[in-house]
Amino acid sequence: MESGAYGAPRAGGSFDLRRFLKQPQVVVRAVCLVFALIVFSCIFGEGYSNTHDSQQQYCVFNRNEDACRYGSAIGVLAFLASAFFFVVDIYFPQISNATDRKYLVIGDLLFSALWTFLWFVGFCFLTNQWAATKKNDVHVEADSARAAITFSFFSIFSWCVLAFLAYQRYKAGVDEFIQNYVDPTPDPSTAYASYPGVPADTYQQPPFTQNAESTEGYQPPPVY
């Protein structure tokens, strides 16, 4: 197995912080983490309100609890996933098994693609509910609601970039495997090698063959 596969140097080297921070997926992942933090913080902090004559809180997005739950859920999960893959990026160069690297890159690719779609759905959902919200239901929470919608929109592109970078790393690993692959099919022009421990064919002429051949020919008849 090649240890320097899937967009990372060979295992066993020392950790280089400067080189790590310059990696594109690390930079974009940090951006995704910040965007997710802003979204669920805005919803948790000021996404709920109540009227003066009631202490019961409601979601500022058209009083639709599902809108606040959805935005909070994808924000929290995106934050946790970004932190997890950030740790994976730190230890990724220390992984010497190319198969383990492949599975981690595939997981990053699939999760990033899925969350790109979920952020798109969340942006459309929150925007639709915000447009249907009555002005009387909005007080000081308007800025937080708009911030949640805005950074949900930005998260679509940041997670899309993460998916693209993961695909590039996966493709680089596959191309390197194909390049280093050696076809085990033997050359038909070469003779088959004998098994180890089996002596070579040392055929010897049977005894008495030469004497029998030398006596062949004309022989005088027997004398009675």
From Swiss-Prot:
Belongs to the synaptogyrin family. The keyword Membrane applies. The modification Phosphoserine is found at S3. It comes from Bos taurus. The modification N-acetylmethionine is found at M1. Residues 202-217 have a biased composition (Polar residues). The chain crosses the membrane at residues 26-46, 73-93, 105-125, 147-167. Residues 20-171 form the MARVEL domain. Keywords: Acetylation, Cytoplasmic vesicle, Membrane, Phosphoprotein, Synapse, Transmembrane, Transmembrane helix. The gene is SYNGR2. The keyword Transmembrane helix applies. One of its GO terms (biological process) is regulated exocytosis. It is a multi-pass membrane protein. It comes from the Eukaryota. May be tyrosine phosphorylated by Src. GO terms for cellular component: neuromuscular junction; synaptic vesicle membrane. This is Synaptogyrin-2. InterPro entries: Marvel, Synaptogyrin.
